[in-house]
Every structure is written in structure tokens, then in C-alpha cells.
């Protein structure tokens, strides 16, 4: 399976749940609760990635990153943003990778 294929497949399952709700589906639960619940889950899972990173447990970190990706895909779908939109933006950024940007603020000052 192509590395991008799994993300597309998951995105399509999420979209299908939105359009064809299945009783008891966690994805449907998120869509029913709306943007605040989805954003809360994205925030919670992102925090768990940070904690798992500090704990130095690769398996936990991978699991938490998968949770962030899943909830982010739900958010994208909720906002009607297609994976292709994200891919296009990443491609544009990749094309600029060798171009130096104007002075950036140091990370510690953000």
C-alpha cells in the first residue's frame, strides 16, 4: 500500500461516516458534537504526543501521533478541506525549500 494511500483511505472512511452515519461510531459522535469537541480532541491528542515524546516510549509516541492524525483528518473533513488541498500546499512549500526566507524570529522568542 502506498504511504499516502492509507491517509486517503482513512479520510474517505471519515467522510463516509459523515455522510452515512453509523450508530455507535466514534467518528459520528465527533461530527454530532461539532467543532468544539473536534478541536478539543485535536488539542488533547497533541498534548499527549508531547508527553509521549518526553517519556521516550516509541510505541506510545506512534500511537499518539496516529490519534493526532485521525482527529486532524476529522477536522479537515468537518471543514470541507480535502487531502489534495493539503498535498498542494505541502508541494508548494517543498518547492521553496532551497529558497532562504527573510530573517525569521528565533523559536525561543515566539
Swiss-Prot record:
It is found in: Cytoplasm. Coiled coil: none annotated. This is Phosphoribosyl-ATP pyrophosphatase. Its main location: cytoplasm. Pfam families: PRA-PH (PF01503). GO terms for molecular function: ATP binding; phosphoribosyl-ATP diphosphatase activity. The gene is hisE. InterPro entries: HisE, PRib-ATP_PPHydrolase-like. GO terms for cellular component: cytoplasm. The keyword ATP-binding applies. GO terms for biological process: L-histidine biosynthetic process. It catalyses: 1-(5-phospho-beta-D-ribosyl)-ATP + H2O = 1-(5-phospho-beta-D-ribosyl)-5'-AMP + diphosphate + H(+). Pathway: Amino-acid biosynthesis; L-histidine biosynthesis; L-histidine from 5-phospho-alpha-D-ribose 1-diphosphate: step 2/9. Keywords: Amino-acid biosynthesis, ATP-binding, Cytoplasm, Histidine biosynthesis, Hydrolase, Nucleotide-binding. Belongs to the PRA-PH family. Gene3D superfamilies: MazG-like (1.10.287.1080). Its EC number is 3.6.1.31.
